[in-house]
């Protein structure tokens, strides 16, 4: 009777251990998904231009489509005897891994009095922007990339 109880007890512990391991693997699979991607976004840009003595010469604006990084990355905090805080942190952020320069033309230009500029020379403004070409999960605070 005592041996049967011991065998049943061992089988029960073994079954609980298997369920625990399976549950942890399932949780790891669910939280292991990263979703960091490059998406299109519409933004409104306004740029002021000043003369040599600092007076407003013209203001130009426009709505343009640009790329942006959006999504989430895996991060974790776990107990650590090596760390002074008692925890080891690994944080990752969805950021640009490569930027490209792009020339944009703003078509709505106004002088300092708010009058729309129509001539070819002042009616448009060329500006340069930098936008992400590729996004990925990068260690948070790492500005080298």
From Swiss-Prot:
Localization: Secreted
Domain CTCK, first and last residues per copy: 36-131
Signal peptide: 1-28
Molecular function GO terms recorded: G protein-coupled receptor binding; neuropeptide hormone activity
InterPro entries referenced in this protein's UniProt entry, alphabetically: Bursicon_suB, Cystine-knot_cytokine
One BP annotation, GO: G protein-coupled receptor signaling pathway
Keywords: Disulfide bond, Hormone, Secreted, Signal
Gene Ontology CC, one term: bursicon neuropeptide hormone complex
Positions of disulphide bridges: 36-94, 60-109, 69-135, 73-137, 91-140
Cited PANTHER family: PARTNER OF BURSICON (PTHR41151:SF1)
Described purpose of this protein according to its UniProt entry: Final heterodimeric neurohormone released at the end of the molting cycle, involved in the sclerotization (tanning) of the insect cuticle, melanization and wing spreading.
Complex formation: Heterodimer of burs and pburs.
Protein's name according to its UniProt entry: Partner of bursicon
Organism placement in taxonomy: Eukaryota, Metazoa, Ecdysozoa, Arthropoda, Hexapoda
């Amino acid at each position: 009777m005592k041996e049967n109880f011991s065998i049943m007890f061992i089988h029960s512990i073994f079954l609980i251990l298997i369920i625990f391991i399976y549950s942890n693997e399932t949780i790891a699979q669910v939280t292991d998904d990263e979703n960091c991607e490059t998406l299109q976004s519409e933004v409104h840009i306004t740029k002021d231009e000043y003369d040599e003595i600092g007076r407003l010469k013209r203001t130009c604006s426009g709505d343009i489509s640009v790329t942006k990084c959006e999504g989430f990355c895996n991060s974790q905090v776990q107990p650590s005897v090596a760390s002074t805080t008692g925890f080891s942190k690994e944080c990752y952020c969805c950021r640009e891994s490569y930027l490209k320069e792009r020339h944009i033309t703003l078509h709505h230009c106004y002088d300092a009095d708010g009058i729309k500029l129509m001539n070819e020379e002042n009616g448009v403004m060329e500006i340069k922007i930098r936008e992400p070409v590729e996004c990925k999960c990068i260690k948070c605070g790492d500005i080298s990339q």
